[in-house]
Swiss-Prot record:
GO cellular component, one term: cytosolic large ribosomal subunit
Family: Belongs to the bacterial ribosomal protein bL27 family.
This protein's name: Large ribosomal subunit protein bL27
Lineage: Bacteria, Thermotogati, Deinococcota, Deinococci, Thermales
Keyword Ribosomal protein: yes
Region entry Disordered, spans: 1-21
Pfam families referenced in this protein's UniProt entry, alphabetically: Ribosomal_L27
Gene3D superfamilies assigned: 2.40.50.100
Organism for this UniProt entry: Thermus thermophilus (strain ATCC BAA-163 / DSM 7039 / HB27)
Superkingdom of origin organism: Bacteria
Amino acid sequence: MAHKKGLGSTKNGRDSQAKRLGVKRYEGQVVRAGNILVRQRGTRFKPGKNVGMGRDFTLFALVDGVVEFQDRGRLGRYVHVRPLA
């Protein structure tokens, strides 16, 4: 058996913190203005009607309403908030 750990083994053993990315509010859910809808890296989802985008590409609701997702093919996937009444 080896009496040394091997050249790489002591330099391994690290991992980064999970970033908790993904969709936070799903289609049909009622949201308040300011609620985070999607956390993402880059524009996997694009902001649609009544949705804003932060510096880190986070999508958030600009008005109170109901979440809607729209797939526009090669134009991308959009997130909208349909206002209540």
